[in-house]
Amino acid sequence: MRLHESSSPFVCILVLSCFFLSVSLAQERAFFSGKLNDSETIVSSFRTFRFGFFSPVNSTSRYAGIWYNSVSVQTVIWVANKDKPINDSSGVISVSQDGNLVVTDGQRRVLWSTNVSTQASANSTVAELLDSGNLVLKEASSDAYLWESFKYPTDSWLPNMLVGTNARIGGGNVTITSWKSPSDPSPGSYTAALVLAAYPELFIMNNNNNNSTVWRSGPWNGQMFNGLPDVYAGVFLYRFIVNDDTNGSVTMSYANDSTLRYFYMDYRGSVIRRDWSETRRNWTVGLQVPATECDNYRRCGEFATCNPRKNPLCSCIRGFRPRNLIEWNNGNWSGGCTRRVPLQCERQNNNGSADGFLRLRRMKLPDFARRSEASEPECLRTCLQTCSCIAAAHGLGYGCMIWNGSLVDSQELSASGLDLYIRLAHSEIKTKDKRPILIGTILAGGIFVVAACVLLARRIVMKKRAKKKGRDAEQIFERVEALAGGNKGKLKELPLFEFQVLAAATNNFSLRNKLGQGGFGPVYKGKLQEGQEIAVKRLSRASGQGLEELVNEVVVISKLQHRNLVKLLGCCIAGEERMLVYEFMPKKSLDYYLFDSRRAKLLDWKTRFNIINGICRGLLYLHRDSRLRIIHRDLKASNILLDENLIPKISDFGLARIFPGNEDEANTRRVVGTYGYMAPEYAMGGLFSEKSDVFSLGVILLEIISGRRNSNSTLLAYVWSIWNEGEINSLVDPEIFDLLFEKEIHKCIHIGLLCVQEAANDRPSVSTVCSMLSSEIADIPEPKQPAFISRNNVPEAESSENSDLKDSINNVTITDVTGR
């Protein structure tokens, strides 16, 4: 149990100084020495915090607590009677006859007390709320505190709050414990604590499983925690100040104190840092851990590393093999790995070459390190001379770190982390030294063979090219017929454009005519001789997609006719050129407006609601009302085009799948799509269905309402948070909010949350969504938790788009294309 492992004599005080003003204690004081009834409160001197009775969201129970007074969202940071609520307004907070601060109900039963031994009386002690959020009990004639809430936190850490241990005076760990639910502040399932062993580390523990570790931060080096995910590597820019006084103390302070912020233990098991945004007038998430599946403690067992950017996540360290190969191959990695070749000192005959080290770069260091102040060469030398030593590391602020026994909870990081040296038998080290020579020899021979084959193939191709050109279109339509299983003759009615016609229409595919870039290739605006404007999608030879997607799109869209689907006018197949010709959408794509503060003003709420309805009708046609059942698989704001009347049209069917009438879902090993819009079952397991399109639809709904992009799933987490807090008006784009439409806007947010629920079976069908939008279904169920897919959680997948305007991570793309 982690809470009893601490051996440090220091007190660790976490100073998260995120307030704008520095004031004296005298200025912060807000006193009370009598009693507070249910309707009465006290406020700190600069009105930052308030103390009194409150009711949590969706609850009528009353609790005594402290909350932020200076923000518009109810934010409780400390609760007194957390597991003994009062069911009416009869509660009283008072200083009792023995000088303690107590909370009593209408029958004068004591529900909570500071419970300190004091010689003071009720008349000589006062309660004081400081502007730091600390509630203190003290003698009126002295500045010495008898009791303070900062030493007894509930679920939140504030600036100057004690979060460590004080071994010299026999103190235990100071922890924060989650609420049971957003409406119930009684102790929940998770606890967080800063444990002081060889190095300070933050831990999250599961109270329902013998305080087992859920997550650890990695060791602190004086600047940051080693094991934070890369996206948060710079969040903990604190500095430790060690004061070697009679009590011993360790403090942390922010490098940036210009933002109001605090940490809290979420009831689902995450430690979250919340930062106040004056612009949004709401809290934003500055940090949330665990952040990836690899953050789960011991995810891969012993002697293995976890990499959230790889599939599978876990791999044995070189020189080790799975302990149970069958379980390992089935994705159960908890058994970990075991050493292949014993170390020199472990062999019966310990002669021969000495052991060496394998260097693993940018690692979250394993748990249970021992500390030494040796230099790096001396650190490694000491490890080799100690039979029990299996790994070592050295870094600024860490000194020499040594591991004995086993290595657990290692993770490969892409930017932060520290080099870890794994001790291996000499034969394991030699294996790697020979590998480059072998690879080089194979490559040299391979290059020669490939070159010869290319020359031969080129001569054959040149001879056959003339014969091939006449059959290009025929071959394409044969593939179309095979895929569609339909009427080849009807597909051939699709107009074929000459290459020269499209080249002339697009000004020879000039950059000035380029509208955007997709996985298929570039998209150009064109104008035919008769004056009709068109959009031309040209297959890029460098595209990771291409011919298969072109054929797929012809199959799908040639059979569809709906006012909310983009219209295919024809195609061009000439030599190596493959192009699709669409009607031109003059208003570009939906994302062109939503995520630009100036252009967003052009879409008022009525327009946005009509766009939502149009998208739903188009998707309903694909799923249920057309002759085929089609799953789009790449529904997103940039694939919603707008005509001159701002009528939405779903586009880009290159990734769509046609479903047989008797199937509801399918599985693929080739996960394609756009990060932020992919349903969890599809992103993580390749399983797609109508409900995966519904998830994408829900993301689009929330983006339309908020005007914010779902980057790294932060939008879903944010919406869920404010939904639970009853502050959903803060989500709505200020450009569209109108009290006249408030009920309709709230309904759309509600529907959006239903669409992005984690379990596919919980999501409504598109037909149900349409009925809810039209008020045919009045009783809308409460949503369950959305799927928060961390970017690093998504296995390597193929992107549906490639653009100069993108941030591409793990081949799952965040697109920023202006439309067709």
UniProtKB/Swiss-Prot annotation:
SMART domains: B_lectin (SM00108), PAN_AP (SM00473), S_TKc (SM00220). Residues 290-326 form the EGF-like domain. Residues 345-425 form the PAN domain. Its EC number is 2.7.11.1. One of its GO terms (cellular component) is plasma membrane. The active site is at residue 634. SUPFAM superfamilies: alpha-D-mannose-specific plant lectins (SSF51110), Protein kinase-like (PK-like) (SSF56112). Glycans are attached at residues 37, 58, 87, 115, 123, 173, 211, 247, 256, 282, 332, 351, 404. Residues 27-436 are extracellular. Residues 27-150 form the Bulb-type lectin domain. It comes from the Eukaryota. The chain crosses the membrane at residues 437-457. The keyword Signal applies. Residues 458-820 are cytoplasmic. It is found in: Cell membrane. Residues 598-615 are annotated as: CaM-binding. InterPro entries: Bulb-type_lectin_dom (IPR001480), Bulb-type_lectin_dom_sf (IPR036426), Kinase-like_dom_sf (IPR011009), Pan_app (IPR003609), Prot_kinase_dom (IPR000719), S-locus_recpt_kinase_C (IPR021820), S_locus_glycoprot_dom (IPR000858), Ser-Thr/Tyr_kinase_cat_dom (IPR001245). GO terms for biological process: recognition of pollen. It is a single-pass type I membrane protein. GO terms for molecular function: ATP binding; calmodulin binding; carbohydrate binding; protein serine kinase activity; protein serine/threonine kinase activity; ubiquitin protein ligase binding. Disulfide bonds join 294-306, 300-314, 379-400, 383-389. Keywords: ATP-binding, Cell membrane, Disulfide bond, EGF-like domain, Glycoprotein, Kinase, Lectin, Membrane, Nucleotide-binding, Receptor, Serine/threonine-protein kinase, Signal, Transferase, Transmembrane, Transmembrane helix. ATP binds at residues 515-523, 537. Belongs to the protein kinase superfamily. Ser/Thr protein kinase family. This is G-type lectin S-receptor-like serine/threonine-protein kinase At1g11300. It comes from Arabidopsis thaliana.
